[in-house]
């Protein structure tokens, strides 16, 4: 049976260069212990929408693409529902430079996927959720460069300046000239600007969002966007879509390098855990059995929801329904976020 403190022994044995990163189990996202209950087969409802909203300009964003690209939005039903909103599909937030994609309203089945033997008690029961409004969601996790543009600092463990001097010396010892070593590390530093920001707390994210008029997605919005109408535990082969312990080389990676889902979102699973706006409730789904509309979680509690898995954890955490949680003041190199906005 899995330890609810997320494999403290495993974390202590992770790759050597993460030794300076706090791996205390007290700071880990926490998951419930799985049960042996056989998951039910759930059929997703019809999610079509009849919106006739006229095409709308957005004062807060620059429009990159008005209509959804069928090469990106590969689900025909989702493509039609996005177009039916009349809203621009792909936009860039002016205050942060974050690229965002439109998610249409609709219904989906939230929680344990049919046949998912790894589903935990807090993912049950699966239940119907209706989201009545479209929303925008960051195409990727917030990057270090985007965070620095707004916050003016970089709290990340994996940041560009951390080991550059020692890397230059190492490259010179390997035969490169000083100028060659500096050029090589400069490129690597530029790449790291596109790594996800991490070591940010839920409270830090709230401050970022207050400055940009963005917000964290609700847990329901997050899972809806992650699934993209897929009722399987993941939206693709986990090695193709996510960075996790077996393929991450013990670190985060540049966003957008794995395959996206059918809505065009990258790294919904793996790379870093993502904060959601909701207060975490372990038994919350039991109150949702009859279906819910625009849910925002429980009203009381101390912890906040975390979703998606991380570069340092097993692949079974990279599941669309997996639910974790953490203290809102918790900062560590396994946790980042992506932003949302209501049009």
Segments and roles (model prediction):
Residues 55, 116-130, 230, 249-251, ...:
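Surface-exposed recognition segments
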Residues 96-109:
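Mature N-terminal segment immediately following signal peptide/propeptide cleavage
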Residues 44-90:
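N-terminal pre-domain segments of enzymes
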Residues 23-24:
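C-terminal motif of bacterial Sec signal peptides marking the signal peptidase cleavage site
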Residues 1-12:
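Bacterial N-terminal signal peptides that target proteins for export
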């Amino acid at each position: 049976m899995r330890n609810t403190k997320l494999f403290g022994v495993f974390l202590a044995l992770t790759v050597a260069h993460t030794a300076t990163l706090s791996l205390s189990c007290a700071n880990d996202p926490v998951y419930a212990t799985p049960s042996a209950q056989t998951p039910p087969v759930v059929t997703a409802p019809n999610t079509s929408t009849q919106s006739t909203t006229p095409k709308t300009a957005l004062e807060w964003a620059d429009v990159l693409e008005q209509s959804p690209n069928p090469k990106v939005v590969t689900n025909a039903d989702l493509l039609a529902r996005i177009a039916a909103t009349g809203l621009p599909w792909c936009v860039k937030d002016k205050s942060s430079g974050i690229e965002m994609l439109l998610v249409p309203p609709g219904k989906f089945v939230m929680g344990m996927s049919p046949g998912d033997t790894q589903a935990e008690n807090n993912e049950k029961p699966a239940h119907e959720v209706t989201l009545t409004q479209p929303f925008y969601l960051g195409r990727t996790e917030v990057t270090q460069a985007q965070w620095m543009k707004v916050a003016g600092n970089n709290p990340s463990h994996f940041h560009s300046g951390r080991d550059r001097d020692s890397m230059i010396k190492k490259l010179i010892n390997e035969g490169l000239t000083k100028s060659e070593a500096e050029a090589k590390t400069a490129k690597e530093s530029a790449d790291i600007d596109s790594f996800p920001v991490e070591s940010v707390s839920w409270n830090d994210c709230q401050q970022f969002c207050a400055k940009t008029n963005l917000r964290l997605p609700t847990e329901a919005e997050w899972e809806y966007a992650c699934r993209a109408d897929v009722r399987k535990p993941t939206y693709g082969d986990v090695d193709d879509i996510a960075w996790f312990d077996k393929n991450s080389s013990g670190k985060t990676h540049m966003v957008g390098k794995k395959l996206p889902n059918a809505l065009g979102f990258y790294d919904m699973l793996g790379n870093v855990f993502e904060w959601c706006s909701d207060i975490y409730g372990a038994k919350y789904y039991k109150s949702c059995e009859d279906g819910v509309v625009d849910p925002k979680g429980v009203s009381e509690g101390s912890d906040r929801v975390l979703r998606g898995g991380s570069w340092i954890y097993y692949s079974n955490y990279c599941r669309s329904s997996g639910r974790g949680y953490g203290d809102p003041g918790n900062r560590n190199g396994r946790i980042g976020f992506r932003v949302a906005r209501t049009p």
